[in-house]
Structure formats: structure tokens, C-alpha cells
């Protein structure tokens, strides 16, 4: 269900500012977006998986806060 190490490295490579940039807001938002997409696909198959649904809501909230932070910084 979680992103594999290779998937995460590819997302980091595409969105990073420098070689080992894993903590910038853009990278965090990109990783959360991929996880949200994956969880959404899982919930289409398993609509009564409430534990995953809560995780989806939490990831959405975290991404929303990061996007808001990024908008205020730029």
C-alpha cells in the first residue's frame, strides 16, 4: 500500500532543488500526492476500509497545510 523506495526516490529526483533534498515543501507535497492517489485507488476496491480512509483524510490535511505554507512563503 505504501510507496516503494524506488517510487519515492523517483519523486524526490523529479521535485528536488538539489541532490539530497528530501524535506522541502515541494518534495513533501509530491510524495503526499502520490500516496493519496494510491490510497484513493485502494479505497475504490475496498470502500469499507475505514482505517485507510482515516489515513487518507490525514494525508489530505497535511498536504493542504503544506500547500498553504508554500503559498505564504512565496
Swiss-Prot record:
Keywords: Ribonucleoprotein, Ribosomal protein, RNA-binding, rRNA-binding. It holds the Pfam family Ribosomal_S15. One of its GO terms (molecular function) is structural constituent of ribosome. Coiled coil: none annotated. Disulfide bonds: none annotated. GO terms for biological process: translation. GO terms for cellular component: cytosolic small ribosomal subunit. Part of the 30S ribosomal subunit. Forms a bridge to the 50S subunit in the 70S ribosome, contacting the 23S rRNA. One of the primary rRNA binding proteins, it binds directly to 16S rRNA where it helps nucleate assembly of the platform of the 30S subunit by binding and bridging several RNA helices of the 16S rRNA. NCBIfam families: S15_bact (TIGR00952). PANTHER family: RIBOSOMAL PROTEIN S15, BACTERIAL AND ORGANELLAR (PTHR23321), SMALL RIBOSOMAL SUBUNIT PROTEIN US15M (PTHR23321:SF26). Belongs to the universal ribosomal protein uS15 family. This is Small ribosomal subunit protein uS15. The gene is rpsO.
Amino acid at each position: 500500500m505504501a510507496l516503494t523506495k524506488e517510487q519515492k526516490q523517483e519523486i524526490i529526483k523529479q521535485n528536488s532543488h538539489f541532490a539530497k533534498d528530501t524535506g522541502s515543501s515541494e518534495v513533501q507535497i509530491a510524495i503526499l500526492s502520490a500516496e493519496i492517489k494510491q490510497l484513493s485507488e485502494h479505497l475504490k476496491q475496498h470502500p469499507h476500509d475505514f482505517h485507510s480512509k482515516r489515513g487518507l483524510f490525514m494525508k489530505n490535511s497535511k498536504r493542504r497545510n503544506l500547500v498553504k505554507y508554500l503559498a505564504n512563503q512565496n
